[in-house]
Regions:
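Composition-driven recognition of glycine/serine/threonine/acidic- and proline-rich low-complexity segments
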Residues: 1-193
């Protein structure tokens, strides 16, 4: 952080941030000097190695995204971190996002932390994509999240390694998919013998 950049702590919207996997308070950095300055940051998740910038004002986003808990890193401009509760029992338990979903709204730019390769897919109206439940990073609030059986038979559930369900997201909107942080953590924890 350069000189002239001041920090302050804000607890505005703390309940929504806390329910969506963030700290109750957030640090706000401001350059009050009038000269060029910067603040450097890194992802805060154990194996996250990517910073994904998303412009909330872009046409396919329409000012609101839903994302994985704890993936919010930073933002600038008009951005609020909130919570959206999903009361559909099957979706809460099996779609990979949980009961309290992180909702980010505004017209600024948000930075999410992710792991591995990040893929962005623009979905047209009614277009659907199936995703491993651990790999959803974020999606436009205009999209619909649901679940779909991963396999038709019992042997597929038991032997495929996919579990019982995949997440299905239907457009219009944008979906961001990344490698599962849980899977990378397991891989990194193994010995190299």
């Amino acid at each position: 952080m350069t000189s002239g950049v001041d920090s302050d702590v804000s607890c505005r919207g703390c309940f929504g941030r806390w329910c969506s996997g963030e700290d109750c308070c957030e640090i706000e950095y401001r350059n009050n000097s009038g000269a060029y300055g910067y603040t450097a940051m890194t992802p805060n998740l154990g194996t996250a190695n990517k910073v994904v910038p998303l412009d909330l004002a872009s046409p396919n986003v329409n000012g609101e995204i839903l994302c994985q808990k704890g993936s919010y890193m930073a933002s600038y401009g008009n951005v609020e971190v909130e919570v959206k509760f999903d009361f559909n029992f099957c979706r809460c338990c099996c779609a990979g996002m949980g009961f309290a979903v992180q909702k980010i709204v505004g017209s600024g730019v948000v930075f999410l932390c992710a792991s591995g390769t990040v893929v962005q897919k623009i979905l047209g109206p009614g277009e659907k994509i199936l995703i491993d439940t651990d790999c959803i990073l974020a999606y436009s609030a205009t999209c619909d999240l649901d679940i779909q059986r991963a396999s038709r038979g019992v042997m597929g559930f038991v032997g495929s390694g996919e579990g019982f369900f995949n997440s299905s997201i239907t457009g219009p909107g944008i979906v961001w998919v990344s490698e599962s942080i849980q899977n990378i953590s397991i891989y990194l924890g193994r010995s190299s013998d």
